[in-house]
């Protein structure tokens, strides 16, 4: 009798956790790879530094992340790979190289980087389980984005990419 009530309690707790809405938790459907992340927390962290970052951007007529050309038209099967490469770009070249004397901004960027590392870890698991295939379309789109990034001076590219983080976050929110 005790075993059945314990099993029922555990089952009830599991259902409660699965069906209770989590604040800010978003399921990203990236082809065969499905992960959950707190995009609202990332967006809130970025919104606190967005104005100061974008104020440093002197290249207002150039875009690195183009909604139609590079992100929005990405087929579901290629989203995982494209996101994996974009996270690597932000982790290896943007967050690490952003220069500012403002310690508050640097702490926020560190927090954003930690959030991206968590997502990247989940994407690595998908890649290990062969559910994050890198097709020609994903590689072509990433090459276009990287080309736009590399056309700018290194620090200008870092500022531009960080200032466009909201475009990437919007795309991630819209993956369904």
From Swiss-Prot:
Annotated S-S bridges: 33-126, 80-132, 81-134
Inducing or repressing factors: Up-regulated by UV-B irradiation in epithelial keratinocytes.
A Gene Ontology biological process term: positive regulation of keratinocyte differentiation
Gene Ontology CC annotations of this record: extracellular region; extracellular space
Compartment annotation: Secreted
Molecular function as annotated in GO: cytokine activity; interleukin-20 receptor binding; interleukin-22 receptor binding
One of the Pfam families matching this protein, by short name: IL10
Domain of life: Eukaryota
InterPro entries the record matches: 4_helix_cytokine-like_core, IL-10/19/20/24/26, IL-10_CS, IL-20
Tissue: Expressed in most tissues and five major cell types: epithelial cells (primarily skin, buccal mucosa, tongue, nasal mucosa, lung, ureter, breast, prostate, fallopian tube, and adrenal gland), myoepithelial cells (mainly prostate), endothelial cells (mainly in small vessels or capillaries), macrophages, and skeletal muscle. Isoform 2 was detected in the lung tissue only.
Keywords carried by this UniProt record: Cytokine, Disulfide bond, Secreted, Signal
Endpoints of the signal sequence: 1-24
Function: Pro-inflammatory and angiogenic cytokine mainly secreted by monocytes and skin keratinocytes that plays crucial roles in immune responses, regulation of inflammatory responses, hemopoiesis, as well as epidermal cell and keratinocyte differentiation. Enhances tissue remodeling and wound-healing activities and restores the homeostasis of epithelial layers during infection and inflammatory responses to maintain tissue integrity. Affects multiple actin-mediated functions in activated neutrophils leading to inhibition of phagocytosis, granule exocytosis, and migration.
Quaternary structure (record): Forms a 1:1:1 heterotrimeric complex with its primary high-affinity heterodimeric receptor IL20RA/IL20RB.
Family the entry assigns: Belongs to the IL-10 family.
Protein's name in the database: Interleukin-20
Species name: Homo sapiens (Human)
Gene responsible for this protein: IL20
